[in-house]
Amino acid sequence: MADAAPQLGKRKRELDVEEAHAASTEEKEAGVGNGTCAPVRLPFSGFRLQKVLRESARDKIIFLHGKVNEASGDGDGEDAVVILEKTPFQVEQVAQLLTGSPELQLQFSNDIYSTYHLFPPRQLNDVKTTVVYPATEKHLQKYLRQDLRLIRETGDDYRNITLPHLESQSLSIQWVYNILDKKAEADRIVFENPDPSDGFVLIPDLKWNQQQLDDLYLIAICHRRGIRSLRDLTPEHLPLLRNILHQGQEAILQRYRMKGDHLRVYLHYLPSYYHLHVHFTALGFEAPGSGVERAHLLAEVIENLECDPRHYQQRTLTFALRADDPLLKLLQEAQQS
């Protein structure tokens, strides 16, 4: 779901509205699952579909733009984005789909092969629903399918073009500070090293429903403010980075029984928000943004800084941007001049 290019706007993380179901004994012992079945309502009334922004049959996901809170249906409502995603199978519950008398529709039968449409019971048929409301034009553009372009950014490009461009944007990260200050999501923190310089909090990413470990996804957010991205890192930050790598892996082992060699630990460049954070995902999970054009393994980042203190100030970095991103045009024009 993450885009190859960062969103420029307010909070970048998606807000989940989900109906979670009871976890198995093994999951509870591993700390998986913290949802509730209490009734909730969407934060708006009505939904008149305006456009399908994007869909993927492979990923079982669709992005919808709609008008909500309309008084008369004449377009005077507000914009909202709703993302519907089929949740992964939970192995311990799969057998329930085939026991008893499941509702079936035969689609095809030939010799030993047959295909059916199976209609699961309610408790096995949840759809993860992410709501962005009210949605701005930037949100609509973020979720709209667009062409991407690879661009190579030198150290000088970053200092002279990318950084001034970012500083000219309204990049609010107040939601990050709310987490660090325990004003929001405090109950979701899995681990914290409170050191103001070399500490961090570890929290489940909202793209992970915490119902299974196959798509485990956590984020480590550093306490120290002012570190925007990979480009800011120097040997001064090595204690922080080592803490995130080793303490983060240990916390995940203790909480979820997943060893470090089953984890992919990396930073994004460009990041989706400009406060240093590190991604922890299950190795077998093809997480959005884990491709070679965006993900930088934390262990290799540490080694690069140990070998060359100015590695990330000088190195040319490759990343993808949307074809209509103003930053892409600025970088292309500079490189053609």
From Swiss-Prot:
Catalytic reaction list: a 5'-end (N(7)-methyl 5'-triphosphoguanosine)-ribonucleoside in mRNA + H2O = N(7)-methyl-GMP + a 5'-end diphospho-ribonucleoside in mRNA + 2 H(+)
Kinase recorded as keyword: no
Tissue: Detected in liver, brain, kidney, testis and prostate.
Positions annotated as active site in the UniProt record: 277
One Gene Ontology term from the biological process aspect of the record: nuclear-transcribed mRNA catabolic process, deadenylation-dependent decay
Effect of residue 83 to A: Strongly reduces decapping activity
PTM sites of type N-acetylalanine: 2
Region (Disordered): 1-35
Entry's EC annotation: 3.6.1.59
Composition-biased stretches (Basic and acidic residues): 13-30
Pfam families according to UniProt: DcpS, DcpS_C
Assigned keywords, A-Z: Acetylation, Cytoplasm, Disease variant, Hydrolase, Intellectual disability, mRNA processing, mRNA splicing, Nucleus, Phosphoprotein
Family statement drawn from the similarity comment of this UniProt entry: Belongs to the HIT family.
Record protein name field: m7GpppX diphosphatase
Species: Homo sapiens (Human)
